[in-house]
Amino acid sequence: MNYNVLLSDQVQVAGAIDPDAYTAATYTTGWISMATYNRIMAIVMAGTLGSSATLDAKLEKATDGSGTGAADITSKAITQLTQAGTDSDKQAIINCRSDELGGAFTHVRLSMTVGTATSDAGAIVLGALARFEPATDAT
């Protein structure tokens, strides 16, 4: 390990869903090329969840940056956060390696769904182990 390398040269912001009060709907990051990173980590952040609200998040894959052939990535979703389950102000993480996409899939994005009631939430996707360093932030 090289202790002279900045952590920000090894881990970059690859995508984000800006923190906000979101109505019941689905929100996504842009498509992220896994040709850039060996791994990504999506961090989903729940703020104050509205009455009876739910928060779901998952990773999706596609064959290009426009979302062609979009599909869910197996086992790449959080356990649903709920207001009833006292999950306000909690975080959840989804990890993904480039070799987990399979087939001709080359891109990923994070999809976050707020259900039932307006809720505070946000997410960030970090790209790590860039194939060419130092990588730069996508956002």
What positions do the PLM features span?
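Extracellular Ig-like/FN3 beta-sandwich strand-entry sites
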Residues: Y37, S52-T54, F105
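Extended, low-complexity, turn-rich repeat/linker tracts enriched in Gly/Pro/Ser/Thr and Asp/Glu
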Residues: G47-T54, T116-D120
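C-terminal interaction-tip segments
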Residues: M1-V13, T113-T139
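N-terminal low-complexity, charged segments
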Residues: A21-T28, D64, L81, A92
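Non-cytosolic beta-sandwich-type ligand-binding/adhesion modules
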Residues: S52-K90
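A short beta-strand element within beta-rich, extracytoplasmic domains
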Residues: N38-T48, L110-M112
